[in-house]
């Protein structure tokens, strides 16, 4: 079983996988309304730039430890070329080293690069590398069909995983009306064919555009607080997958949400080992509630289910019978961002201005049902006007055949600084 931990380093690396404009316009409108009539209004800057630096101390399962250093540059551009056309670009460059004097390894990612055309008030057409995110859940998003193989961050934080990932090259057309919308996405194959989420994909196009696929979505307001979203997704050579997103207010402080996807598909184990002999209808879902407490504290409790995962005891049996094949399944699960077991649980807590102004706390615990696999993550972040300091702690527990026990490191401590421009 130690082979899984030895190969876990590559698995851990895999773990490292138009709405913003509307939000910005809304914020600008509110600020303008609150301003005095004679107060000048600053034009919104079309770009953002973050400079990151940090150090990480990790402890392996055998008791040895290692230190790593990282520097990163993350930029976004949202520029209006014409009244109805804008260009969106997002990119990230990282440099990592084992010591301060060692040679740095540089990696770069083009997260987004597309043109958006709005021919009318209710039509939008986008083309290029687009980072489309779907789903209402927090820890596991079954309907986020373009998530597979896209993550480029080593952080287990679900917010970071959804933000720091590769978009897929696609064309998207959207029609809007007062109470709903419908959109169609077409994403072509632009690299050698392989299944989405394959850990052996070694370049951006292989990770995101190795197969032809399309996605049709629609939403419609029902009542005052209900607006479900329906999805139909298909990859070339595979059966269509159907999805549903739903959330609603429960009282004044709680949001209840549900996310479901289903269709004919192989098990995770068969997919990872290129067998696909057990194709049948399988469901994946996430149900949860987010509650906002006084003092700006928010908690989320989420139950996760993966019909392609293994039942209780199967991970131990498969790991003992064929460690290499089971290691493949674990590697695929990280790239797919799917639980390994049939059921899992996720709890997330966040709080702002803890004890002092500008000090935020965030953390989660996730656990697989059926084994002792656990993962915990905690962050303290102090916000200033132009930068922030954060201290992160991460801990895994589990036997070598579990998805958390197979990771190469038992614990990590990170100290990070982020400069905002």
Describe the role of every protein-language-model region:
Residues 78-191, 220, 398:
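Outer membrane beta-barrel
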Residues 65-71, 106-111, 165-169, 176, ...:
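Residues that define the transmembrane beta-barrel architecture of outer-membrane proteins
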Residues 75-81, 117-118, 129, 174-177, ...:
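Residue-level signature of outer-membrane beta-barrel architecture
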Residues 51-57, 89-95, 127-129, 184-188, ...:
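Transmembrane beta-barrel strands of outer-membrane/channel proteins
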Residues 13-15, 19-66, 76:
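N-terminal periplasmic/intermembrane-space "pro-region" immediately following the signal or transit peptide
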Residues 347-349, 382-388, 393-395, 407-421:
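Outer-membrane beta-barrel "beta-signal"
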């Amino acid at each position: 079983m130690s082979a899984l931990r030895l190969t876990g380093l590559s698995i851990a690396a895999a773990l490292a996988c138009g709405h913003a404009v509307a939000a910005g316009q809304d914020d600008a409108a509110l600020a303008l309304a609150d301003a005095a009539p004679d107060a000048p209004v600053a034009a919104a800057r079309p770009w953002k730039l973050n400079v990151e630096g940090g150090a990480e101390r990790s402890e392996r399962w055998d008791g040895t430890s290692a230190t790593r250093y990282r520097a990163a540059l993350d930029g976004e551009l949202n520029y209006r070329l014409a009244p109805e056309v804008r260009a969106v670009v997002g990119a990230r460059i990282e440099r990592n080293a084992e010591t301060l004097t060692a040679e740095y390894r540089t990696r770069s990612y083009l997260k987004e690069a597309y043109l958006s055309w709005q021919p009318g008030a209710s039509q939008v057409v986008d083309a290029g590398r687009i980072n489309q995110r779907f789903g209402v859940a927090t820890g596991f998003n079954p309907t986020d069909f373009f998530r597979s193989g896209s993550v480029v961050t080593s952080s287990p934080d679900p917010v970071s995983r959804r933000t720091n990932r590769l978009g897929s090259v696609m064309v998207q057309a959207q029609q809007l009306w007062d109470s709903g919308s419908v959109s169609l996405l077409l994403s072509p194959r632009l690299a050698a064919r392989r299944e989405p989420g394959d850990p052996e994909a070694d370049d951006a196009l292989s990770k995101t555009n190795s197969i032809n696929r399309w996605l049709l979505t629609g939403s419609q307001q029902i009542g005052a607080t209900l607006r479900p979203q329906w999805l139909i997704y298909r990859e070339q050579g595979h059966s269509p997958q159907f999805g549903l997103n739903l959330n609603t207010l429960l009282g004044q402080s709680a949001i209840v949400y549900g996310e479901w996807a289903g269709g004919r598909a192989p098990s995770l184990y068969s997919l990872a080992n290129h067998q696909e002999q057990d194709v049948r209808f399988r469901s994946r879902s996430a149900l949860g509630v987010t509650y906002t407490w006084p003092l700006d504290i928010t908690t989320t409790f989420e139950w996760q289910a993966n019909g392609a995962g293994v039942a209780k005891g199967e991970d131990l049996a498969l790991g003992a019978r064929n460690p290499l094949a089971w290691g493949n399944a674990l590697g695929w699960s990280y790239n797919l961002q799917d639980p390994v077991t049939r059921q899992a649980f996720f709890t997330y807590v966040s709080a702002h201005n803890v004890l002092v102004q500008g000090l935020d706390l965030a953390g989660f615990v996730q656990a697989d049902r059926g084994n002792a696999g656990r993962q915990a993550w905690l962050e303290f972040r102090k916000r200033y006007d132009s930068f922030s300091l954060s201290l992160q702690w991460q801990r895994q527990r589990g036997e070598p055949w579990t998805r958390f026990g197979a990771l190469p490191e038992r614990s990590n401590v990170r100290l990070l600084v982020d400069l905002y421009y």
